[in-house]
């Protein structure tokens, strides 16, 4: 992000809350978003977060989450400049420890207990079933740009998944169905001195809660249905919906969850490649990840 633009956004936010300009320290910066801790002359601190599309809906999601009683950082002010969103919010401080599986279970149970938010995008059964077709569309656009030309295996895998999607997607609206955080990882559960808070709602939507549960352990390792089953059982024991353990689409719940989560991730990676990032230099990094995830999808969804 252009430094002058981020400075202008921060100036706008400070004006809204009646504070002088603070000192800034980066916490983490990505290509389309960033997080900073800002310290005001009186010693008080806040978190300054900025993002552009498709991460520019987070303020809306945070407000909806707060209205429903979810533990999220308090939002003090928001501003828009040149299609960039700026937010000033509570500084929760340094976590006292990393979140573990039980923290993730507790967060998921609370998230899934609140009523769905009508202002969030919807990903129901039809939306899930459309993901492989959307990914094929992304592949076609990439090929028209003379990129991803040696990816016939990706096309074949997506075709198989698309053909089976109508059957495998069955059960998508079984409980838990509602809030989906979509970036649900241990780093999104902040465990502080005053309890835990959920962070990073930029891509929240309404859909199958199993997508979140399947995302918690990340995507860098080979997906483990056994580990996923244990996590689902912990979730139900902690008060989560019993149907989280129910078979869906002719598959065990854990295979369904992991398979559709990986398919959701594949479509997102390919959309980034052609639309949001759109940098051919990054294709050598994206293609192997997509191949690996598609191999997992084919195996997990048994297509």
Regions found by a protein language model. Name each.
Residues 4-17, 118-182, 246-247, 293-303:
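An alpha-helical support segment within catalytic cores of ATP-dependent transferases
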Residues 33, 83-86, 190, 195, ...:
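A generic structural signal for beta-strand entry/edge sites
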Residues 105-106, 197, 214-216:
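Glycine-rich, phosphate-binding/catalytic loops in enzymes
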Residues 210-243, 259-282, 293-295:
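Active-site activation/catalytic loop segments of kinase-like enzymes and analogous catalytic loops
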């Amino acid at each position: 992000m252009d430094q002058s633009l981020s400075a202008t956004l921060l100036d706008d936010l400070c004006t809204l809350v009646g504070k002088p300009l603070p000192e800034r320290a980066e916490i983490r910066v990505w290509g389309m978003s960033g997080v900073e801790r800002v310290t005001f002359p009186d010693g008080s601190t806040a978190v300054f977060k900025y993002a552009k599309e498709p991460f520019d809906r987070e303020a809306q999601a945070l407000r909806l989450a707060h209205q429903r009683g979810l533990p999220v950082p308090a939002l003090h002010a928001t501003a828009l400049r040149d299609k960039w969103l700026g937010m000033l919010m509570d500084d929760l401080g340094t976590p006292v420890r990393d979140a573990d599986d039980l923290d993730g279970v507790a967060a998921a149970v609370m998230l899934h207990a609140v009523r769905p938010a009508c202002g969030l995008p919807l990903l129901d059964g039809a939306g899930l079933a459309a993901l492989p077709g959307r990914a094929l569309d992304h592949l076609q656009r990439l090929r028209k740009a003379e990129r991803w030309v040696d990816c016939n295996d990706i096309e074949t895998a997506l075709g198989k998944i698309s053909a089976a999607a109508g059957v495998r997607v069955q059960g998508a609206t079984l409980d838990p169905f509602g809030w989906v955080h979509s970036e649900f990882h241990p780093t999104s559960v902040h465990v502080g001195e005053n309890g835990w808070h959920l962070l990073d709602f930029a891509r929240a939507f309404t859909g199958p809660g199993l997508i979140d549960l399947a995302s918690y352990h990340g995507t860098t390792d080979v997906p483990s249905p056994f580990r996923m089953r244990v996590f689902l059982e912990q979730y139900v024991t902690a008060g989560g919906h019993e149907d989280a353990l129910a078979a869906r689409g002719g598959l065990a719940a854990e295979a369904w969850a992991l398979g559709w989560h990986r398919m959701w991730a594949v479509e997102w990676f390919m959309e980034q490649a052609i639309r949001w990032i759109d940098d051919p230099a990054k294709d050598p990094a994206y293609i192997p990840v997509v191949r690996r995830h598609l191999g997992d999808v084919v195996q997990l969804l048994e297509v």
